[in-house]
């Protein structure tokens, strides 16, 4: 039985992870977890899964829960996340928190010898060189939870990675894929949160609409698979049936197909290289799709993706700036402070004023992250 530490238990990935564990109690046990502010959902999870250790964000929530669950050890804040991530009894850390707050817990878990299932792409975006170096030194497996990277991992199974011609990441195009740049000036938060194919959290859904999410995934793929940015291509695949592909030097492609359901890559990360049965409401049949559609990305329509490629190629602290600026800009949009079409402009502004620092250490990354957030907040 694998003992799981789950960071971000009440979020979209966390909820679907718990569904898998609920279906397979003989294979998995939740021994520690974290959640943010959703106390009602968090209480229910603690009651059902009976973790031994829990981290919440606020001190007041920790105090309340300590009184309700005297047999559980509680922590709070970033230090709480770090405590939970290194819980001695855990085998696998599944990091499903949103944002760069996931970086330090991941590094701590690697140092503690945990296997890592990574859904927190910001960890690799901001500090991929540090994370991959630490994982290599500790001989730790780093398995992707994102559907695109899981698809690539499956396509590469047994293949010689030196024979890769390029990686092809697929994208749905998000909520506004059929709108022009001019039409984006009037879109609302409610409209932006209606993703055509996937059920995701708010921040991730907005990132999908701007294509910043795909940009972060390009950087994640660069680190996970050691492929140059010029050899990573993004294409629009409207149906979200082909989750990603690998092209090899002989011109052949290997793709992974399936229903757009995050339980598939989650279970693969937890069971790799094995697989589990997943009960779907509707069986996936390839014959239900008379055609699959592919489109080139229009970088004028989706400037966020171009910014992400530029940040990745510049390297150093520039990806940290892009990520931090985007997190603040998206929060501003969700709170009604920023128009949707201004999200990219805020990120570009932050990148233009920053001189990248090459091969940054952890302290430098954290400092640049905080400085960028503070700067972008002044622009809201």
Swiss-Prot record:
SUPFAM superfamilies in alphabetical order: 1-deoxy-D-xylulose-5-phosphate reductoisomerase, C-terminal domain, Glyceraldehyde-3-phosphate dehydrogenase-like, C-terminal domain, NAD(P)-binding Rossmann-fold domains
Binding positions for NADPH per the UniProt entry: 10-13, 36-38, 120, 122, 201
Membrane-spanning intervals of the chain: none
Pathway named in the protein's UniProt entry: Isoprenoid biosynthesis; isopentenyl diphosphate biosynthesis via DXP pathway; isopentenyl diphosphate from 1-deoxy-D-xylulose 5-phosphate: step 1/6
E.C. code: 1.1.1.267
Domain of life: Bacteria
GO terms (BP aspect): isopentenyl diphosphate biosynthetic process, methylerythritol 4-phosphate pathway involved in terpenoid biosynthetic process
Binding site for 1-deoxy-D-xylulose 5-phosphate: 121, 147-148, 172, 195, 208, 213-214, 217
Cofactor or coenzyme needed: Mg(2+); Mn(2+)
InterPro entries on file: DXP_reductoisomerase, DXP_reductoisomerase_C, DXP_reductoisomerase_N, DXPR_C, DXPR_C_sf, NAD(P)-bd_dom_sf
UniProt keyword list: Isoprene biosynthesis, Manganese, Metal-binding, NADP, Oxidoreductase
Binding site for Mn(2+): 146, 148, 217
Catalytic reactions of this protein: 2-C-methyl-D-erythritol 4-phosphate + NADP(+) = 1-deoxy-D-xylulose 5-phosphate + NADPH + H(+)
Molecular functions (GO terms): 1-deoxy-D-xylulose-5-phosphate reductoisomerase activity; manganese ion binding; NADPH binding
Described purpose of this protein according to its UniProt entry: Catalyzes the NADPH-dependent rearrangement and reduction of 1-deoxy-D-xylulose-5-phosphate (DXP) to 2-C-methyl-D-erythritol 4-phosphate (MEP).
Family note: Belongs to the DXR family.
Protein name, entry field: 1-deoxy-D-xylulose 5-phosphate reductoisomerase
């Amino acid at each position: 039985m694998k003992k799981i530490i789950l960071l971000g238990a009440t979020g979209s990935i966390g909820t679907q992870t718990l569904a898998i564990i609920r279906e397979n109690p003989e294979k998995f046990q939740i021994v520690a977890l974290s959640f943010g502010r959703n106390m009602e959902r968090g209480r229910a999870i603690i009651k059902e899964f009976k973790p031994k250790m829990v981290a919440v964000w606020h001190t007041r929530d920790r105090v309340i829960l300590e009184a309700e669950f005297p047999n559980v050890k509680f922590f709070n804040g970033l230090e709480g996340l770090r405590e939970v991530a290194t819980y001695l009894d855990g085998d696998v850390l599944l990091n499903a928190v949103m944002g760069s707050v996931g970086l330090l817990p991941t590094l701590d878990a690697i140092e503690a010898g945990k296997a890592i299932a990574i859904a927190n792409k910001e960890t690799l975006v901001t500090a991929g060189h540090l994370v991959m170096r630490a994982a290599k030194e500790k001989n730790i497996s780093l398995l992707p939870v994102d559907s695109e990277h899981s698809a690539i991992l499956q396509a590469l199974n047994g293949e010689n990675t030196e024979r890769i011609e390029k990686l092809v990441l697929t994208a749905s195009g998000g909520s506004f894929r059929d709108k022009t740049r001019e039409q984006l000036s009037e879109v609302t938060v409610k409209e932006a949160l209606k993703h055509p194919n996937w059920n995701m959290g708010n921040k991730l859904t907005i990132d999908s609409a701007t294509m910043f999410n795909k940009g972060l995934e390009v950087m994640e793929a660069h680190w996970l698979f050691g492929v140059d940015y010029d050899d990573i291509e993004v294409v629009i695949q409207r149906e979200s049936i082909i989750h990603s592909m690998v092209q090899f030097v002989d011109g052949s492609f290997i793709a992974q197909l399936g229903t757009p359901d995050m339980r598939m890559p989650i279970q693969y990360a937890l069971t790799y290289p094995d697989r589990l049965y997943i009960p779907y409401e509707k069986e996936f049949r390839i014959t239900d799709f008379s055609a699959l559609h592919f489109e080139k990305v229009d970088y004028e329509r989706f400037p966020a993706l171009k910014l992400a490629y530029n940040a990745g190629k510049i390297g150093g602290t520039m990806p940290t700036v892009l990520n931090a600026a985007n997190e603040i800009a998206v929060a501003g949009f969700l709170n009604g402070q920023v128009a949707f079409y201004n999200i990219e402009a805020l990120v570009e502004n932050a990148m233009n004023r920053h001189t990248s620092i090459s091969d940054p250490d952890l302290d430098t990354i954290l400092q640049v992250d905080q400085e960028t957030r503070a700067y972008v907040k002044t622009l809201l």
